Amino acid sequence: MPFLSRLFHYGVDLALVSTCVAGIRRSSGISFEVEKIHNEDVKTAVEKYLNFGEWAFDQSSAFLGSSTWFKKV
């Protein structure tokens, strides 16, 4: 059971980091240069990871935007 707990914790941490990277890209325009990765398998994995962050950022923004507890400034 501790293994699954640790695995879940690492998964959530990775998702949060990916979402933060997406937010940084959206707010400042700074992004990770995937083209500098030479290994195609690693490049594909990094692209999927960053795309997940974009999706999570979009979903979070849509959810918070529809809530009455938050307002756009």
From Swiss-Prot:
This protein's superkingdom?
Eukaryota
Query: Can you say where in the cell this protein is located?
Result: Mitochondrion intermembrane space
- Which Gene Ontology terms cover its molecular function? lipid binding; membrane destabilizing activity
Name any GO cellular component annotation.
cytosol
GO biological process annotation, one example: mitochondrial membrane fission
Question: InterPro entries from the xrefs?
Answer: Mitofissin
User: What UniProt keywords are attached to this protein's entry?
Assistant: Autophagy, Mitochondrion
Q: What phenotype has been reported when the gene encoding this protein is knocked out?
A: Impairs mitophagy. Does not affect reticulophagy, pexophagy, nor the Cvt pathway that delivers the precursor form of the hydrolase aminopeptidase I to the vacuole.
* Subunit-structure text: Homooligomer. Found as homooctamer in solution, but binds to membranes either as a monomer, dimer, or tetramer, not as an octamer.
Q: What the protein does? A: Mitochondrial fission factor that acts directly on lipid membranes to drive mitochondrial fission required for mitophagy. Directly binds to lipid membranes and brings about lipid membrane fragility to facilitate membrane fission and engulfment of mitochondria by the phagophore.
Which family is this protein grouped under? Belongs to the ?ATG44? family.
Recorded protein name is Mitofissin
Q: What organism does the UniProt record list as the source? A: Schizosaccharomyces pombe (strain 972 / ATCC 24843)
